[in-house]
């Protein structure tokens, strides 16, 4: 999967590192060269110096072939504009980090999709969800929501003596 991340701050860099470990083709773009220093040598990612609202920079990054474009700079307007441009250039899916809670209203989803923004990330809501999930399931080490929460995958730690270790799920859950 070809992924372009605009914004090499804490969120963008962390995301790029995670995707690098999953062997995704990842390009991290930022207008500040100091934020990109060493990342391409320490991790399996490409770095690119450029503004996410520059059409030329987006084209050079290969946005027209991107499966996913994620804009996570600290500037909400820049993120939204970058996604609109990336969509127009040909990115298949776009995600913008936002600061305005109002934008998360489900009635606005079609509006943002028309603009070319497929998903919105609001960091405070994500953090709150993680805290709530942690309180509900303190025994869970990792949690992944797949397909918008339709499927939830959990990572748990088991003792070596646990009876379910090395058992196929089919046997644990039964035939249905």
Language model regions located:
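Cytosolic regulatory regions of ion transport systems
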Residues: 1-176
